[in-house]
Amino acid sequence: MFRIFQSFAIVLFCLLSSLSLGQGVNIPSPNWGIGIGNSTRFNGLRFNFIDRNIEEINGLNLTVWYDKNFEDHTGTFKGLGIGVPVAVGTKNRYGVSAGIFAVGAGNDLAGVNIGGLAVGGGRNVAGFNVGGLAVGAGGNIRGFNLGVLAVGSGNHLTGINVGGIAVGAGGNITGLNFGGLAVGSGGNITGVNLSVLVVGSGESIRGISVSGLVVGAGETVSGINIGGLVVGAGESVNGINLSALAVGSSEIRGMSAALVVGGEEVTGFSVAPAYFRITGENGAMKGIALSAFNHIKGFQQGLAIGIVNYAFEISGIQIGLLNYVRENRKGLRLLPVFNARFD
């Protein structure tokens, strides 16, 4: 029985190879039924050695090999596709596709796609996509995407994205994103973002972001942000911001807690056991600051509690061992216990 099956497989392999350059043998019609060979337009059950110069295939397609000349990857496939070793060969692929090594399309790939090593599209990838190593697209990725190593998009990434090492996009990332080492975007990151090392964005981060080392953005960070060492942004940090070492930005709004908290304008409730700092030409603290040293090189509006408190100008109260207000007249600038503005 095994020998019969083996002989049939060899004959089928040779037949597919010989028909791969032609139109194939199709029963009962040239365009539908059961097809063997490189039929470029067909509906039904189709077996082929290499797909090339396809127009449109609908149904169940089994391909043995792939064409290394990507100019021959044309047309559209819709249905259930199985590739040994890869399910590729068309510009667009829609439906359910599985490849021992990879599943791919020159342009768009949508549906359920499982590749032993990778799933990729030259333009967009959408649906449920699992790559043994990676899921990638030159354009956008949408849906549920799992790459044991990485999920990466040249443009936007949307949905549930899990990369064993990293999740990254050249544009925006939106949804639930977990990168074993990093979640990174050249644009904005929005949603729930988890990483062992870094969550980083070239523009803004909004939502819940948790990272073992750093949560950082070139512009703004907003929401609930927890960085093992640092939470920071080039313009502003807003919301609940927690870090073991530092929270820093030009503007900080909300509740912030770290060993060091600093910025040009800090509004809200800040806890910095080691050092709280306001600096800049228009520096201001508005709210409550708790720190061993509240170093406000600007305007304090609110309450500062610490061992040492320092402010240029004040509309509020300092409580601590040593309290200094530079705008007060001599004799009232440095006081124990508390200080305020004395005209």
Stretches with model-predicted labels:
Residues M1-A9:
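Bacterial N-terminal signal peptides that target proteins for export
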Residues S17-L19:
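N-terminal signal peptide c-region/cleavage motif recognized by signal peptidases
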Residues G22-D343:
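Surface-exposed, glycine- and small/polar-enriched segments that build interaction surfaces at terminal
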Residues L12-L15:
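Repetitive helical segments and hydrophobic/amphipathic motifs
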